[in-house]
UniProtKB/Swiss-Prot annotation:
Stretches the record annotates as Non-LT domain: 26-269
Gene Ontology MF annotations: peptidoglycan lytic transglycosylase activity
Protein name from the UniProt record: Membrane-bound lytic murein transglycosylase F
Domain of life: Bacteria
Region (LT domain): 270-488
Annotated signal sequence range: 1-25
Chain's gene name: mltF
Length: 488
């Protein structure tokens, strides 16, 4: 009869105790801020990456690279300053995550693997790549996994490729390979190119960015399925930063940012075959030193990156001052007679006059473009107009807009330019027929040559060679002018 009231009393007492504890807890310390809140409070986004053409490197105009550009945009979205540090190897990269005052994000072209899942947490994917077995031109080409047996194979320590080969050993116990934490992808490709090792395994995007430096390397076959690149964060206390990263990457995919970055860094990397790469490497050693000072002076005088001028000159004439085409354009920068007169060039075969005139003409074109065209597209449009003329370029922009594409984005206009050679299209334009595929080819090649010149003239590479056999890309002679030339 009295049991129910007793239970009620005990319940009331228990609730009172719980309430008291909650009140006491409320009088204690503030809840710990989330990882994202801590990052924002510090005012900077600390990112660790790798030093390579496909990720991040410094040239005379500052930091560049696919991963750097993407991380910079993320920092800007958060209203933070970007602080970059580079890791000596992949093990140290992952080890640095989560340290006090260390990086909070790894943006380094990383593939998620079972082993790495114990070291970090990964974002949604942003780039697809394929792991590829690389061999040396002239050697027997492997075509299947069994062909790897008995070969000297070297890969990066701590890489997804090392894990992939370990997994392959379960099927092929005789397989042997080595790992090193003292090399980068560039070193692996150089070692294959020079015959120091038989094979390596790298991702397709890394090969695409670097193959031109090593004309002897070839893809043997794809090993396994396509992988996806992701950013990584430390296995922290909450998901706030990771969720913000995922949202940023998904927005970047939806609004075209990722596609534009892919086009900028990878949309032109496959334009040089073996012959083109080999020839360019030779001409860098044998021809560029004669004209480098002229390119630097013209770049400085016209506020153009001298390496862009040099890339244009190579595409136009292979750095030959006496070059002449069947259409009458002449000289190192291949100027028409009318253009030469308009920029004060009296002798198109004089290399200094030609380079100076080409620089002035390019600046004129660049300045005349509509304000709606922003960098870096503005430079690509100026290159196209340099090649095909501003009128034809404007025709292509109008056709692009009519197709519902963006007339201010090179990645859209380059798709339409070849139509200027087709009657059904050029008959609708003001300036008529043009070989519209040529400016697309011109821009793509100039961009590739410019990329190479930018990479090999890094301060840490100047005066050195990428390889020892005399056919690869030399550093630029330190005895020539050393002023920093700002880009357009």
């Amino acid at each position: 009869m009295f049991a129910r009231p007793a239970i009620r009393m005990r319940c009331a007492t228990g609730l009172l105790a719980i309430g008291t504890l909650l009140m006491l807890a409320g009088c204690g310390e503030e809840p710990k801020p989330s990882v994202l809140e801590q990052v924002k409070a510090e005012g900077e986004l600390r990112v660790v990456t790798r030093n390579s053409p496909a990720t991040y490197f410094q040239d005379r105009n500052g930091a560049t690279g696919f991963e750097y550009e993407l991380a910079k945009r993320f920092a800007t979205d958060l209203g933070l300053e970007l602080k970059i540090e580079t890791a000596d190897n992949l093990d140290s990269l992952f080890a640095s995550l989560g340290h006090v005052d260390g990086p909070v994000l790894a943006a380094a072209g990383l593939v998620e693997t079972p082993q790495r899942q114990r070291q970090a947490r990964f974002s949604v994917p942003y780039l697809e790549v394929t792991p590829q077995i690389i061999y040396r031109q002239g050697e027997t080409r492997p075509t299947k996994a069994e062909d790897l047996l008995g070969k000297r194979i070297l890969v990066l320590a701590g890489s997804s490729h090392a894990e992939q080969l370990e997994a392959l050993k379960l099927e092929l116990p005789e397989l042997t390979f080595e790992v090193s934490d003292a090399v980068e992808v560039v070193d692996l490709l150089r070692m294959v190119d020079e015959g120091q090792i038989d094979l390596t395994l790298v991702d397709s995007n890394e090969l695409a960015m670097n193959q031109v430096y090593f004309p002897n390397v070839r893809v043997a076959f794809d090993l396994g399925d396509t992988n996806t690149m992701r950013w990584a964060v430390a296995p922290g206390e909450d998901d706030s930063l990771l969720l913000e990263i995922d949202a940023f990457l998904e927005r970047s995919q939806a609004n075209g940012t990722l596609q534009r970055l892919k086009e900028r860094y990878y949309g032109h990397v496959d334009v040089l075959g073996y012959v083109g790469a080999y020839t360019f490497a030779q001409h860098l050693q044998q021809r560029l030193p004669r004209y480098e000072k002229m390119f630097r002076q013209a770049g400085h005088a016209n506020q153009i990156d001298w390496r862009l001028l040099a890339a244009m000159g190579y595409q136009e004439s292979l750095w030959q001052p006496n070059a002449t085409s069947k259409t009458g354009v002449r000289g190192l920068m291949m100027l028409t007679q009318r253009t030469a007169q308009s920029v004060g060039v009296s002798n198109r075969l004089d290399p200094k006059q030609s380079i100076d005139g080409g620089a002035r003409y390019f600046v004129q074109i660049h300045q005349q473009l509509p304000e709606s065209i922003q960098e870096p597209d503005r430079t690509w449009f100026a290159l196209a107009a340099y090649n095909v003329g501003g009128g034809h370029l404007e025709d292509a922009r109008k056709l692009t807009e009519a197709e519902g594409l963006d007339p201010n984005k090179w990645m859209d206009v380059q798709k339409i330019l070849p139509r200027l050679a087709q009657k059904q299209w050029y008959s609708k334009t003001r300036y008529g027929y043009a070989r519209g595929g040529e400016p697309v080819h011109f821009v793509r090649n100039v961009r590739r040559y410019y990329d190479i010149l930018t990479w090999v003239t890094q301060p840490q590479l100047e005066g050195t060679q990428v390889a020892e056999n005399g056919i690869h890309l030399p550093g630029i002679d330190k005895r020539t002018l050393d002023e920093q030339t700002p880009p357009l």
